[in-house]
Amino acid sequence: MDFNYDDTQKKHAAMIAQVCAEQLAACGNEHSRYFTARQWAICGEAGLLGLSIPREYGGQGLGALSTAIAMHAFGLGCTDMGLVFAAAAHQFACAMPIVEFATAETKRDVLPKLASGEFIGSNAITEPEAGSDSSNLKSRAWPQADGSYRLDGHKSFAGNAPIADIFVTYATTQPEYGALGVSGFIVHRSSAGLRVSEPLDKVCLRSCPAGEVFFDDCRVPEVNRLGEEGQGRQVFQSSMGWERACLFAAFLGMMERQLEQTIEHARTRRQFGKPIGDNQAVSHRIAQMKLRLESARLLLFRACWGMDQGDPGQLNIALSKLAISEGALASSIDAVRIFGGRGCLESFGIEAMLRDSIGTTIFSGTSDMQHEIIARELKL
């Protein structure tokens, strides 16, 4: 078993580190409160918006493991996790369903624009009364005589929605089949009957604007359906595999950056005539941070390796997602405690990691739902 990166993976990681240090860090962005078009353009130029999109459509054509390694480098080098999240949601929850389930014509039309960043993608599945229970959708899509669909519904917490050009969304087409009667669709921002709210104020990932999406007699051409009618559950689960693995690789990078900062602080901050790291209470917290990081890394790479072998096992992906989510939150709390009052100041960046890590336990499937998936896969 070889734990080393290959030459291509090393090259991508080094390139991303350079882009983060030389270009993204210079953007400032007022403590990462707002989305900026300049940062998005930099990501597009660097290929960060199409890591897993095939080369024939302008992407990098990376497999799951290489994509995760690249996203780890992105989260390690970029202090604006909202931007990282926006880029990840764009390609894993929006572009990848199009890669895997759209028609050849739609792929040729949409994917190059997503890979370059000309189009911004959003995934809209969550509803006011359908969060974790994503199969209980109230949104409906009715087939029309001309082959199109009439879409009505209300989506909430859609990442990138206020700035998106393309939406991947889901609606019930055959209610008598329950979860097997859901279909996936691509909806363009210019579609009549589509309306998006102003950005929602939230505690975490602020530079990735989230909003509500309303479909009111919105017409969607049949060519914009993803896969067959009733295949929406498969489309969504596939996209969640990519998102739970490769998006969360970025938060593994954040955990590593956080650990490096905390170790440096513990070595240089002196109290009672010695570095605070000499105190067992501090050093043991840092040891736990390291344990969480390395355990999560192994689970992540195992899950991504399986995806590349054609085995997107839900068990390994859920284990990885849960380890990173809970590990990031626990380590962020430890980091704030070690930094003390400075950990509560925006200028040190530690409080932002704590806020952003709260979100990791909720989006892309809550930690409670990951426990449920793990228990189900163990036949409990």
Swiss-Prot record:
Keywords of this entry: FAD, Flavoprotein, Oxidoreductase
InterPro entries, A to Z: Acyl-CoA_Oxase/DH_mid-dom (IPR006091), Acyl-CoA_Oxase/DH_mid-dom_sf (IPR046373), AcylCo_DH-like_C (IPR036250), AcylCo_DH/oxidase_C (IPR009075), AcylCoA_DH/ox_N (IPR013786), AcylCoA_DH/ox_N_sf (IPR037069), AcylCoA_DH/oxidase_NM_dom_sf (IPR009100)
Residues that, per the record, bind FAD: R269, Q280
Keyword Transcription regulation included in the entry's annotation: no
EC number(s) per entry: 1.3.8.14
Gene Ontology MF terms in the entry: acyl-CoA dehydrogenase activity; flavin adenine dinucleotide binding
Enzyme class: oxidoreductase
Disulfide bonds: none
Active site residues per record: E243 (proton acceptor)
Chemical reaction(s) catalysed: L-prolyl-[peptidyl-carrier protein] + 2 oxidized [electron-transfer flavoprotein] + H(+) = (1H-pyrrole-2-carbonyl)-[peptidyl-carrier protein] + 2 reduced [electron-transfer flavoprotein]
The keyword Oxidoreductase is annotated on this UniProt entry: yes
Names of the cofactor(s): FAD
Similarity comment: Belongs to the acyl-CoA dehydrogenase family.
Function noted in UniProt: Involved in the biosynthesis of pyoluteorin. Catalyzes the desaturation of the L-prolyl-[PltL] to yield 1H-pyrrole-2-carbonyl-[PltL].
The protein's name: L-prolyl-[peptidyl-carrier protein] dehydrogenase
Species of origin: Pseudomonas fluorescens (strain ATCC BAA-477 / NRRL B-23932 / Pf-5)
Taxonomic lineage: Bacteria, Pseudomonadati, Pseudomonadota, Gammaproteobacteria, Pseudomonadales
